[in-house]
């Protein structure tokens, strides 16, 4: 949308429900969005009880999901790092994780497959929307979770069913999304 508006400026501010984001046009067809800093505490995500949000275990349909990383990047996310992100039927397990009692405001669910330290492929269940072909906040949440778990560098490409986003994390955990 921004690229087609013939703006005199290459930078604007975008107001969301709970954040003010800086956006700037980079190159001919891309926009970099400063997403801000993630929130990590059980209260800020939020979780219904105080636990380690960087190592969550859930049981869904007799399947045990371990090592879930919960983070709020403007909305709440849980990321599970798995061998094959498309192995899991998100249409079945996505809504069950989204509506789990641990998540009082529901949660976005990402199955993430680390290809290498610069590339991650994801399969995303977005709360209230279902399985999606792409999700910017899921890309940011996945990148910060991978970086904190030392699975990826502070700059990583997140690949979706359709397209990809480049995510950079600076020294203060500020997240930049380009696509």
PLM feature spans:
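Active-site proximal loop and beta-alpha junction motif in alpha/beta enzyme cores
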Residues: 1-132, 144-179
């Amino acid at each position: 949308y921004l690229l087609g508006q013939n703006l005199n400026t290459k930078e604007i501010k975008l107001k969301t429900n709970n954040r003010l984001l800086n956006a700037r046009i980079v190159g001919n067809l891309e926009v970099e969005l400063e997403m801000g800093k993630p929130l990590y505490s059980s209260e800020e995500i939020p979780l219904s009880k105080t636990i380690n949000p960087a190592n969550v275990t859930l049981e869904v349909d007799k399947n045990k999901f371990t090592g879930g990383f919960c983070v709020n990047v403007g909305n709440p996310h849980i990321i599970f790092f798995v061998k094959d992100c498309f192995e899991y039927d998100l249409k079945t397990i996505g809504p069950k994780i989204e509506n789990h009692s641990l998540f009082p405001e529901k949660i976005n669910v990402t199955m993430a497959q680390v290809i290498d330290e610069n590339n991650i492929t994801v399969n995303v269940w977005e709360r209230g929307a279902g399985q999606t072909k792409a999700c910017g906040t899921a890309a940011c949440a996945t990148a910060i979770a991978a970086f904190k778990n030392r699975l990826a560098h502070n700059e990583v490409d997140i690949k979706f069913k359709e397209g990809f986003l480049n995510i950079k994390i600076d020294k203060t955990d500020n997240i930049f999304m380009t696509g």
